[in-house]
């Protein structure tokens, strides 16, 4: 697996919401949806390499999938993993930029 494939297998998507926007402004923290197998070290390396920034800290949260019903049948959404990435002061990432 090449380094680009490794990066994109670790980082799935940025999470954009009012809460994440507030975190960006107040504490220079960005939130990403990451692979379930990704470690903090993997996330840190991927963000530093992809966005060319210096990461100060990474916190990871496992989010449990919700129970939902569809046409009177019970089902579950999948579990997923969320990473809070704090950057060194003075650096930023444009997560809204289009590829």
UniProtKB/Swiss-Prot annotation:
Family listed: Belongs to the universal ribosomal protein uL23 family.
GO CC, one annotated term: ribonucleoprotein complex
Function, in words: One of the early assembly proteins it binds 23S rRNA. One of the proteins that surrounds the polypeptide exit tunnel on the outside of the ribosome. Forms the main docking site for trigger factor binding to the ribosome.
InterPro entries: Nucleotide-bd_a/b_plait_sf, Ribosomal_uL23-like, Ribosomal_uL23/eL15/eS24_sf
Species this chain originates from: Xanthomonas oryzae pv. oryzae (strain KACC10331 / KXO85)
PANTHER family: 60S RIBOSOMAL PROTEIN L23A
Complexes and interactors: Part of the 50S ribosomal subunit. Contacts protein L29, and trigger factor when it is bound to the ribosome.
Name of the protein in question: Large ribosomal subunit protein uL23
Keywords assigned: Ribonucleoprotein, Ribosomal protein, RNA-binding, rRNA-binding
Lineage: Bacteria, Pseudomonadati, Pseudomonadota, Gammaproteobacteria, Lysobacterales
Gene Ontology MF terms in the entry: rRNA binding; structural constituent of ribosome
UniProt-listed Pfam families: Ribosomal_L23 (PF00276)
NCBIfam families from the UniProt entry: PRK05738.1-3, PRK05738.2-4
């Amino acid at each position: 697996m090449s380094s680009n494939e490794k990066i994109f297998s670790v980082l799935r998507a940025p999470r954009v919401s009012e809460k994440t926007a507030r975190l960006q402004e107040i504490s220079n923290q960005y939130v990403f949806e990451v692979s379930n197998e990704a470690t903090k070290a993997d996330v840190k390396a991927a963000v530093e390499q992809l966005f060319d920034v210096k990461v100060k800290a990474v916190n990871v949260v496992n989010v449990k999938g919700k129970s939902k019903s569809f046409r009177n049948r019970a089902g579950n959404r999948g579990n997923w993993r969320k990473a809070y990435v704090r950057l060194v002061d003075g650096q930023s990432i444009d997560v809204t930029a289009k590829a």
